[in-house]
Amino acid sequence: MSLVIPEKFQHILRVLNTNIDGRRKIAFAITAIKGVGRRYAHVVLRKADIDLTKRAGELTEDEVERVITIMQNPRQYKIPDWFLNRQKDVKDGKYSQVLANGLDNKLREDLERLKKIRAHRGLRHFWGLRVRGQHTKTTGRRGRTVGVSKKK
């Protein structure tokens, strides 16, 4: 970062209920938002026509609004379906990019649905066990250790 800080520099930006560090480069700063990774951030910034080397605090209000609208409506800006993190939603079959609090809500809804239909994955989540086929004989134990009593 240069030694001279611009007049309208924002050290912390509030975007989609997330605090973003204004001193970081914009491409990496917006990855602080849940549901936005480095690749998605680069694609969004290219579509918004924003310089990737710019600091997040140097953005104007107009540029921030552009980034937010592209992140929330990626299909309108011709970001391909395979790039999105919510494909063929179970309820409505739509493709979307779920961000911030919406991501937590969708994950919770998915787990509740799996538990409700008594799917194997849902039951494993309910019991607090490993879900993806890992062995559980020796690892993943919780609770107090049971000692061995000595013979007399």
From Swiss-Prot:
Disulfide bonds: none
Glycyl lysine isopeptide (Lys-Gly) (interchain with G-Cter in SUMO2) crosslink residues: 91, 94, 106
Gene3D superfamilies: 1.10.8.50, 30s ribosomal protein s13, domain 2 (4.10.910.10)
GO biological process, one term: cytoplasmic translation
Stored Pfam families: Ribosomal_S13 (PF00416)
Residues found modified as N-acetylserine: 2
Keyword vocabulary terms for this entry: Acetylation, Cytoplasm, Isopeptide bond, Ribonucleoprotein, Ribosomal protein, RNA-binding, rRNA-binding, Ubl conjugation
Modified residues (N6-acetyllysine): 94, 106
Cellular component per GO, a single term: ribosome
MF terms (GO), sorted A to Z: RNA binding; rRNA binding; structural constituent of ribosome
Localization (cell): Cytoplasm
Source organism, top-level taxon: Eukaryota
Similarity comment: family membership: Belongs to the universal ribosomal protein uS13 family.
Quaternary structure and interacting proteins, as annotated: Component of the small ribosomal subunit.
Its biological purpose: Component of the small ribosomal subunit. The ribosome is a large ribonucleoprotein complex responsible for the synthesis of proteins in the cell.
Database matches in HAMAP family: Ribosomal_uS13
Protein's UniProt name: Small ribosomal subunit protein uS13
Annotated source species: Homo sapiens
